[in-house]
């Protein structure tokens, strides 16, 4: 991966469909999220299509599935397939994995194998969909131990989710699990764990900013929202106290980097801060520099 050639690193993209056409979520949840985000373009690009999309734009992308099989009954896109696609497109794709925390010891073993054999750089958790509190010691802490030990990254969805939005009962998805203060406990208990709080954390934006300011290992990605809707305090912190800890993320394919970047250019972000957010902070966190 040539850092000099890349204009940006998108730290938040999804592998929505496997090579066999299997989706990571059922159709109702996919359709609801498409309506919520007003998706432009193809909703379920293949891994190869995603690589080509980012290569055309001279961007790199962190890519992952979401394993929430215990809660949803739907198998995820295989982590191994995501990692293999990233290896085949190593100029643009960076593999993360996702492991249902309710897999227990089998999940812990799988996490270690994915790092050692497949070169996975981090793990995505979606507490809303997976149905767990990030600070539940009995459920997730053994996984965090492996992630901290291997020097990889734990990326947590925070705040409201478009998944299930508008579906009766929200599709059974509960928002309470994704308050970033639950991740504050994780950061305190695993002081060397590298953490990303994904998204502007509505309705807990101030909590996310407090956690990222207080805990050295905690970063924030800006995915899932058009920048024109960012809360003003998020923009203020990105320009100042958190200028080295805020990361560009789109949430592709539900939100394209083209749309995100066009709106980002309209924000009052300092010229010296823009390259940090778009590439430099992510490159350092991912160990690419």
Segments from the language model and where they lie:
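Alpha-helical scaffolding within the catalytic cores
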Residues: 43-50, 77-83, 107-109, 180-183, ...
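Short, flexible/disordered intra-domain loops and linkers
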Residues: 25-28, 38-39, 71-74, 164-177
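Catalytic metal-binding/acid-base residues of hydrolase active sites
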Residues: 14-16, 100, 128, 159-161, ...
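Mid-to-C-terminal alpha-helical segments outside catalytic/metal-binding sites
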Residues: 1-14, 18-56, 60, 112, ...
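Conserved, mostly hydrophobic/aromatic
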Residues: 12, 82, 95, 123, ...
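Active-site gating/metal-coordination segments in enzymes
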Residues: 60, 68-165, 228
């Amino acid at each position: 991966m040539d850092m000099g050639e890349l204009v940006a690193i998108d730290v938040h993209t999804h592998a929505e469909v496997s090579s066999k056409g299997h989706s990571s979520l059922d159709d109702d949840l996919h359709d609801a999220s498409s309506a919520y985000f007003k998706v432009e373009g193809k909703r379920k690009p293949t891994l190869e299509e995603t690589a080509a999309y980012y290569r055309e734009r001279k961007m790199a992308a962190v890519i992952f599935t979401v394993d929430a099989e215990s809660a949803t009954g739907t198998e995820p896109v295989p982590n191994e397939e995501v990692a293999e696609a990233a290896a085949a497109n190593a100029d643009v794709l960076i593999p993360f994995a996702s492991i249902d925390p309710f897999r227990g010891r089998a999940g812990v073993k799988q996490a270690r194998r994915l790092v050692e054999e497949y070169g996975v750089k981090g793990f995505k958790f979606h507490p809303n969909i997976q149905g767990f509190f990030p600070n539940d010691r009995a459920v997730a802490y053994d996984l965090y131990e492996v992630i901290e030990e291997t020097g990889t990254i734990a990326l947590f969805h925070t705040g409201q989710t478009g998944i299930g939005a508008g579906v009766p009962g929200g599709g059974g998805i509960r928002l309470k699990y994704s308050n970033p203060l639950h991740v504050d406990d994780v950061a305190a208990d695993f002081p060397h764990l590298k953490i990303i709080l994904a998204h502007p954390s509505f309705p807990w934006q101030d909590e996310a900013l407090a956690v990222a300011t207080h805990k050295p290992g905690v970063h924030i990605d800006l995915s899932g929202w058009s920048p024109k809707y960012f809360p003003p305090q998020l923009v203020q912190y990105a320009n100042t106290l958190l200028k080295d800890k805020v990361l560009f993320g789109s949430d592709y394919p539900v939100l394209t980097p083209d749309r995100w970047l066009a709106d980002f250019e309209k924000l009052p972000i300092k010229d010296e801060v823009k390259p940090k957010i778009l590439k430099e902070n992510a490159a350092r966190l991912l160990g690419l520099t």
